Amino acid sequence: MPPTVNMGIPGASRSIVENLKRKRVLLAEPRGYCAGVDRAVETVERSLRKYGPPVYVRHEIVHNRHVVETLERAGAVFVEETDYVPEGAIVIFSAHGVAPTVYAAAAERNLRTIDATCPLVTKVHNEVKRFARNDYDILLIGHEGHEEVIATAGEAPTHVQLVDGLAAVQQVVVRDENKVVWLSQTTLSVDETMRIVERLRQRFPKLQDPPSDDICYATQNRQVAVKAMAPECELVIVVGSRNSSNSVRLVEVAMGSGAGAAYLVDWAKDIDPAWLAGVTTVGVTSGASVPDILVQGVLKWLAERGYDVVQSVTTANEALVFALPREIRSAH
């Protein structure tokens, strides 16, 4: 059983490597699949079993190349818009959510829809609708062009303004400073988001907070684990795809928390051996849309190069499970 470095679970122990010079890996816990991703991927898998291929999916079901390619081989067809789906066919909406206009377009073509939107994204959609009904200006902190942001803003486009970074704060214009609320994309850096909120509040002192955290539990947990291990790491390897917002944020968090270097890789083969020069401790984690088989591939690659001591850095335990969409709950 590998030694454990526990940074947040009561009653757990911290084992010390006898030879501190020995090459080692710090493995972040939690990492990888979150409840929303697990639900979305299983939705596609069960739909393929229930209805048979092809099953159409609007956009990548989650932002991970391995997952998408695996589902494509099983018969999933990924399309950018519902226009590419044959009339009357089944289409699954990705974990990132869709705007009401997408539902309307699907209905016009008699498509049978299955919604794999993460329930935590749906929560933000509901917040947008509620604040829009009360005629608030909604400042949505997020990344321009990200599918989740497009979908969330689409719930109330006349009320939502995107705030993409600190520089965008100065461009915000509101109608009534007493009726302003901020919401956020679920996969952002917690620290960066709060810096933006602080700047917004300097401009709008009566800025309201969301009813509850919009940044999801899994995003926060993975960032906390990286923060805990980064100061001890000369190198952090984040397994994840470049179009995965939460994976990219983990690289940023690692660098901002004291790691000597941090890189994003899809697979073990993407690792440059030159990164290991002079490195004793390597941190490893993965984004919320990454299956653990890819992390195991990285650990094997590192072990072959002498990094054969693996210590878990545990900051939280996760047990959340979301119910599947009703259309496929009976499929096994």
From Swiss-Prot:
Pfam family, one: LYTB
Residues that bind [4Fe-4S] cluster: C34, C118, C216
Binding positions (dimethylallyl diphosphate): H63, H96, H146, S244, S245, N246, S289
Amino acids binding isopentenyl diphosphate: H63, H96, H146, S244, S245, N246, S289
InterPro entries: LytB/IspH
EC number: 1.17.7.4
Alphabetical list of Gene3D superfamilies matching this protein: 3.40.50.11270, 4-hydroxy-3-methylbut-2-enyl diphosphate reductase, catalytic domain (3.40.1010.20)
Keywords assigned by UniProt, alphabetized: 4Fe-4S, Iron, Iron-sulfur, Isoprene biosynthesis, Metal-binding, Oxidoreductase
Transmembrane portions of the chain: none
Residues of the active site: E148 (proton donor)
Cofactor note: Binds 1 [4Fe-4S] cluster per subunit.
Enzymatic reactions: isopentenyl diphosphate + 2 oxidized [2Fe-2S]-[ferredoxin] + H2O = (2E)-4-hydroxy-3-methylbut-2-enyl diphosphate + 2 reduced [2Fe-2S]-[ferredoxin] + 2 H(+); dimethylallyl diphosphate + 2 oxidized [2Fe-2S]-[ferredoxin] + H2O = (2E)-4-hydroxy-3-methylbut-2-enyl diphosphate + 2 reduced [2Fe-2S]-[ferredoxin] + 2 H(+)
Obligatory cofactor(s): [4Fe-4S] cluster
Xref: HAMAP family: IspH
Family of this protein: Belongs to the IspH family.
Function text: Catalyzes the conversion of 1-hydroxy-2-methyl-2-(E)-butenyl 4-diphosphate (HMBPP) into a mixture of isopentenyl diphosphate (IPP) and dimethylallyl diphosphate (DMAPP). Acts in the terminal step of the DOXP/MEP pathway for isoprenoid precursor biosynthesis.
NCBIfam families for the chain: ispH_lytB, PRK01045.1-3, PRK01045.1-4
Name of the protein described by the UniProt record: 4-hydroxy-3-methylbut-2-enyl diphosphate reductase
Organism taxonomic ancestry: Bacteria, Bacillati, Actinomycetota, Actinomycetes, Mycobacteriales
Gene that encodes it: ispH
